[in-house]
């Protein structure tokens, strides 16, 4: 591909609104000014270097475009269950807990809820942002408060002013990383601003506040929980909905997908496997079938015991 072809290819994509200079810059490592100048043949720097970088970007772009398009989002029975808890917390200005095993679709459901509703904010807690200051800072950034104070007191007051009157919903993903002090801070923020709050994560989110592990601090928060949703495993209806979205309806394929979805990682493993199987089948001009699914399980070297499935 020569420089003229690269310029023409990029110009076509931008003019057809398939991408933007900003997106190309972000993904290629070049500045928007450099890309614009290069496309218009006005770049005074090393055109050869820039052309090589943009050729690599173009090749990757077209390779991705040729892949079979996965379903953007599948509204499963579990998704509806999670959304019900989120709507309840929002409408009643209360706290809800959504807990469950990894890979059952909690995070994707929350992201879609945020995308399709106004005044919904979501942050994901990591060990490095599990303190009061770091957690509140994450929330401030999510709220667009890029110049928020960097001290706990002023930051908490700024967040209260920002959230008051919004009738919004704050979703805290991976909330099992949070200790009593941070949860108490979030509880007070929720109460004072009358927003909804959803704490989401593994079962430790809830078990910390109940049973033998319950401390005085956790017990105070527990008494404020209005709704708890526990998702222990993937429902058969969820797998069927995902299979339908991928246009997979053979009995053997459905049975295999159902068995895999019961393993640790559930829908996450299922989606990775479906994408790889779809890529392989697409390259051969065929539809996804049982053989492609089994091959995908093998190639992904999944950390699940599927040996009995593959022998059947």
Curated annotation (Swiss-Prot):
Signal peptide: none annotated. The record marks 268 as: Sensor-2. Its cofactor is Mg(2+). Gene3D superfamilies: B transposition protein, C-terminal domain, lambda repressor-like DNA-binding domains, P-loop containing nucleotide triphosphate hydrolases. It comes from the Viruses. GO terms for biological process: DNA integration; DNA replication; DNA transposition; viral DNA genome replication. Pfam families: AAA_22, Phage-MuB_C. The keyword S-adenosyl-L-methionine does not apply. Residues 21-40, 223-312 bind DNA. The record marks 224 as: R-finger. Transmembrane segments: none annotated. Changing residue 220 to A: 12 fold decrease in ATPase activity due to impaired ATP-binding. Selects the target DNA sites for transposition. Recruits DDE-recombinase A to the target sites and catalytically activates it. Displays non-specific DNA-binding properties. Polymerizes as helical filaments around the DNA. Coating of the DNA by the target DNA activator B might play a role in favoring target-primed replication over integration. Prevents self-integration into an integrated copy of the viral genome. This is ATP-dependent target DNA activator B. The gene is B.
